Amino acid sequence: MMDTKIYDAIVIVTPADFKRVECNNQRIVEYLPVRKVLFVGSEELKELVGQSNLGDKAGFVNENDIIPFEDVYNCMKDVMADILLGRELPRGLVGWYYQQFLKMKYSALCDDEYYMSWDGDTVPCKDFSMFDSEGRPYFDMKYEYHEEYFITMETILPSVKKIVDKSFISEHMIFNRNYMNELI
């Protein structure tokens, strides 16, 4: 099933996780209502995607072509210097934030009006649409709250505070490329 709008999906995943959920990758490619599923990651991931049996609907984008990890790491390290007090920022703590920056910055490479992000460990079970009958995208919200994310967000962006009880973090999200480009 394809949506009424034509767009691609990005799945940001490490090579280890791509292998760990290998049985799910076929379902992601089969059921997402997109033109192409682009797995985003390192050069090692490129090899795994190329060796997979996912077909022509699967592709690869090098994460460094979107935004290098070191750029995000160094930015967070600089902004959090007062908290770190000379300690090294653990690279593992940057991973989740890096994923969010990749999802946003992909808008600069995207040629379509929309693109979707999809978590590689989330398995679609049937065909679905990300748009209603009038072509408006669906927007998922959750009730998750992870205090450490908001502490970090307020450190990086002091003027941004949590003002609604819902979370906008979801296993999948549709992005309007133009809105995202304006936002960033």
Labelled PLM ranges:
Residues 48-108:
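Active-site-proximal specificity loops/subdomain of glycosyltransferases
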Residues 102-141:
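GT-A fold catalytic core of metal-dependent nucleotide-sugar glycosyltransferases
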Residues 19, 43-50:
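Short, charged/polar "capping" segments at the starts of alpha-helices
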Residues 1-26:
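N-proximal low-complexity "stem/linker" segments adjacent to membrane-targeting elements
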Residues 37-42:
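Short internal beta-strands
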Residues 125-184:
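Conserved catalytic core of nucleotide-sugar-dependent glycosyltransferases
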Residues 5-7, 35, 112-114:
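Short coil/turn segments at beta-strand junctions that form active-site/ligand-binding loops
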Residues 26-35:
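Short, acidic, metal-binding catalytic loop of nucleotide-sugar glycosyltransferases
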